[in-house]
A protein has these predicted regions:
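Short, low-complexity disordered leader/linker segments with a strong preference
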Residues: 1-39
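Immediate post-signal peptide segment of exported/extracytoplasmic ligand-binding proteins
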Residues: 27-41, 60, 129-135
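Short, polar/charged alpha-helical segment
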Residues: 39, 45-70, 76
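Short helix-initiation/N-cap motifs at beta->coil->alpha
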Residues: 68-79, 166-194
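Beta->alpha turn/N-cap motifs
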Residues: 70-74, 84, 88-98, 188-189, ...
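Short beta-strand-centered segments that line the small-molecule binding cleft or hinge
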Residues: 82, 86-89, 107-113
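Ligand-binding "clamshell"
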Residues: 99-111, 124-126, 198, 203, ...
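A conserved helix-loop-strand patch within extracytoplasmic ligand-binding domains
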Residues: 111-161
Length: 225
């Protein structure tokens, strides 16, 4: 068990404990679908399954059973909460949630935080960002929040320049300078890792890269939260 795993586990434990406390203090009553099992159902992303399962085992000591439901995309967990199929989800940034609510008018509320996810720039074909060719193909997520995170990281790496670095919803239309004429390919966030072997550069999430077994997640040109 690595130090990073232990530190993240503590952060997730705090977050899930807050979820448990929230439902308990609010006088949470299980619906008929939960009546027999007394289970608090929480939606998560696959890369965090092992970590969060260990946390759920700890939360069990507080008297509430936690069932983790894995979702392969980042849209379904919020839909599931909105529809009442699960009790909560635990996978997204506050900016991502705010944008989802703005786009869908879902009645969702944030009440717990956990460990933040690192993101980075990765390439199989090139050893440095300077060696990227003109019109290099760069794979970024297609959701507004993580697409902006990718562009901001590319700006900080000196590959492009954005109109406003503080705009958390920047799009490719906000690029004011692109010296290498980078070509952007947008895919669903969880799938950027699968483009590692073919693209010139990807904006990747270490947990997904590790799960896809395509590269060492620590071998990034830039790695940040």
């Amino acid at each position: 068990m690595t130090q990073s795993f232990i530190q993240n586990r503590k952060k997730w434990l705090i977050g899930l404990s807050i979820i448990v406390a929230f439902f308990s203090l609010a006088g949470y009553r299980y619906s008929k679908s939960h009546a027999q099992d007394d289970v608090l159902t929480i939606g998560i992303s696959p890369p965090y399954a092992e970590l969060l399962q260990s946390v759920a085992d700890e939360v069990k000591k507080q008297g509430i059973q936690v069932k983790l439901v894995e979702f392969s995309d980042w849209h379904a967990p919020n839909v599931a909460v909105q529809n009442g199929d699960i009790d909560a989800n635990f996978f997204q940034q506050s900016v991502f949630l705010s944008n989802a609510i703005r786009e869908t008018n879902y009645d969702l509320h944030a009440f717990a935080t956990g460990a933040g996810s690192h993101v980075g720039l990765y390439s199989k074909k090139y050893k440095s960002l300077d060696s990227l060719p003109t019109q290099a193909r760069v794979v970024i997520p297609n959701d507004p929040v993580n697409s902006a995170r990718a562009l901001i990281l590319l700006h900080r790496a000196g590959l492009i320049q954005l109109k406003d670095l503080n705009n958390e919803l920047s799009t490719v239309q906000d690029i004011v300078s692109n010296p290498k004429q980078l070509q952007f390919i947008e895919v669903e966030g969880p799938h950027t890792a699968h483009a590692f072997n073919d693209a010139d550069l990807i904006f990747g999430f270490p947990h997904y890269l590790k799960m896809a077994k395509v590269t060492d997640p620590h071998h990034a040109f830039f790695l940040t939260r």
